[in-house]
Every structure is written in structure tokens, then in C-alpha cells.
Amino acid sequence: MARNKRLAESLNGALHSLFERHSDLYLLGEDIVDPYGGAFKITKGLSTRFPDRVFTTPISENAIIGAAGGLALCGNRVIAEIMFGDFLALGFDQILNFATKTVSLYGGRKQMRLVVRCPVGGHRGYGPRTARTCRSTSSVSRTCRCTS
């Protein structure tokens, strides 16, 4: 009988599988390297196994998403890890005015293989500034999709 996995373990396993399959996949975010592995341990073990493709960043959501967008523009697959969904607004300029428009600026010839991943919602005791769900903000462009 298979044991029930926590969502964090499932996401971590999925990321490990993606990194094994795609040598052009990069991950950028705050505190995501080992031994910490991110606020929710989703990235645990990735920086040890793939040290050339997993990068911790300064606390600047705008810079994280901007750098990730630049890597994606160069043809790479990129995951930008934002610690909490509430902080997504700080990087929204890069999403709205760079990442989503780039596909149109190149007449559809360029792909932006960019995922901005962030946990949303509460129930963890981090307080009101890290508990909001920001799904409606990602429906501003036809090239931007939100899943949860």
C-alpha cells in the first residue's frame, strides 16, 4: 500500500523529475538552496543534485522574475520561486510588461517557458501579509495562465 504523501513531498518529487528530464531547466528564488530548501521545503535536495541550475537570490521578487524572464527569453525553461503569493505583486511589472508581452513582441516566434511558482493561502501561522490568494491578478494577459 502506498503511503500518503504530503503535497510538499509530491511537488519536490515532481521538480526532481523535471530537472532530470530537462537539462535546460533553471530554478531561482529566495532561500531555496540546501540545507534550507525553501520556506515549505519544496526545493529540498535540488541545489545539491543540480548545483549549476538552482540559484538562491536576494529578496527582490522583481529581480527574481526579471532574471527568470531573461533566462527564458534565451530559450531555457525557468521556474521563479516566490516565497509567498502576497509578494507576487512586487514582481508583477516583470510579468505584465516583460514576460507576457515578449511572445507578442516576437510575433509568436519566441516562447517564454517561464513558471512563477508561489504558495498562496493561510493556515500556517505566518500572519495576514502572507495569507492572501492572488489568482485574479494573473488573468490580465492571454499569454499568462494561472493554475492552483
Regions from the PLM with identified roles:
Residues M1-S148:
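Thiamine diphosphate
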